[in-house]
Amino acid sequence: MSKKMFIRQAGNTLLNTPLLNKGSAFTLEERKNFNLIGLLPANIETIDEQVSRAYEQFSLFNSAMEKHIYLRNIQDTNETLYFRLINQHIEEMMPIIYTPTVGEACQKFSQIYRRNRGLFLSFEDQDELEAILNNAPNTHVKVIVITDGERILGLGDQGIGGMGIPIGKLALYTACGGISPEHTLPIVLDVGTNNSALLSDPMYMGWRHPRITGDQYDDFVDDCLKAIRRRWPNALIQFEDFAQANAMPLLMRYQNQFCCFNDDIQGTASVTVGTLLAAAHATGKKLSAQKVLFAGAGSAGCGIAEAIVAQMVSEGISVQQARSQVFMVDRWGMLEQEMPNLLPFQKPLAQPASLRTEWQIEANREISLLDVIQHAHPDVLIGVTGVPGLFNQEIIEAMAEDCERPVVMPLSNPTSRVEAKPEDILMWTQGQAIVATGSPFPDVVLAGKRYPIAQCNNSYIFPGVGLGVISANAHRVTNEMLQQASITLASLSPMLNGGNMLLPPLSEIQNVSRKIALEVAKKAVEQGKASHRTEERLLERIDEEFWYAQYCEYRRIAS
């Protein structure tokens, strides 16, 4: 506790301030100076003794949901202890504080609600936005995660229950990326809900109204974002879990106005490209020489596809050639240029009609996932559909028929929505597939051999991107910055050093984030999106911003 902090809070006010509370770790001198004598048990503990007790209590709970609620209670009581506990048990606790458990927490948000965290910007309060933002407990906000709760993971419209996602994401910004919780703020836009179960639930805590749409929605979001910029002009804004109809349009509208990005589109794309680059080392085949098949052609799938195209182009092939190697399949079959009602972001990825003729597929039926596998012979299969079991034995065996080491990535969250289970993929390919999933899965043992399953988790990317952006004081997040994050992640793959894991273990996530932060910051400077700084100074800035879960020594300021 060498670092000193001067504060005014005392007594129960101090104990009820999660960012400052130390609980049983307050020293005797602090207990006297801050009117805490008698408010705490006599024994003075270290933070590691507190962690031991907290972990023992955590281990007593049986269900993941109970553990999630317990950890959230610690977060709302003592944030330093919370993050110290998370950091010491990151691999065990990440699935509890975020996917897959956070999905259930969002569904049950109103039932398990205990204490306020973050801001709720309700359409009913649209004339009070400035006042609401001024009510935020954290005044020096640097990173904001914002959602409207309409597309929570694969679970659909959860209304204000979607607040669980920004809370969880920002916990990972801190646990993985070292961004002080003091500088983070979760926000949910309460624009109503179309979830009839929530509207009829007497416990639902949000605005009981069908979702606003059209100009009303666009104007409200615009008002909110501009109010946020006036309040915190340099804050990084991460869009999270907006529905397909809004996600891409919002990104396109604001990415050149604000320091912002969409994690579902760009973060998922970045970690996927990083994972594919790592897999390319294992297969010995450059990404630009591979064919990639997508199941799912929404904003997330197309965002990943465009990032793959950009990486292929950076390896020396033309955009036209790269697009010809990427195949998008949705519920109506493979995207074709002649299809009516293609969305703007789908059109560049649609294949020409001549391909149907070349493959000799009759005009009156859709081109299925299996059709593409049998005719295009892809190297990579990526799932972003939320359709469990979509990658069945026939699909996986067809992938392996013409590809010695197919890369299969069922990325849908939560676990209940995954397109295929890793153990099935490996069994159907006799252990030859390279598997990465969006949700956490245990290692698979097949024929006496252990196969680690890489979790293609955005937490490998966005914490480092955030740290890099705020350390460089960048005013934009560019696709090139995210591409640099992908390349950096791939360079840290244990496979480069003879290991059998695609991605670094989560126990090394802070080191990964720091390396990504430096490369992202350098790219921001190179592109003129941040003021010029040397690499040495950027490293110093990363060190200055990086927050460690340890207690400070308190000195009292007279009220």
Swiss-Prot record:
Kindly list the positions annotated as binding a divalent metal cation.
240-241, 264
Residue positions annotated to bind NAD(+) are 151, 264, 413
The cofactor required is: Mg(2+); Mn(2+)
The record lists the catalysed reaction(s) as: (S)-malate + NAD(+) = pyruvate + CO2 + NADH; oxaloacetate + H(+) = pyruvate + CO2
The catalytic site is made up of 98 (proton donor), 169 (proton acceptor)
Q: Site described as Important for activity, positions?
A: 264
Q: Which SUPFAM superfamilies match?
A: Aminoacid dehydrogenase-like, N-terminal domain (SSF53223), NAD(P)-binding Rossmann-fold domains (SSF51735)
- Tell me the Gene Ontology biological-process terms attached to this UniProt entry: malate metabolic process
PROSITE patterns tied to this protein? MALIC_ENZYMES
Co-factor remark:
Divalent metal cations. Prefers magnesium or manganese.
How this chain assembles, per its entry, is: Homotetramer.
Similarity-based family: Belongs to the malic enzymes family.
Looking up HAMAP family in the UniProt record yields: NAD_malic_enz
Q: What is this protein called?
A: NAD-dependent malic enzyme 2
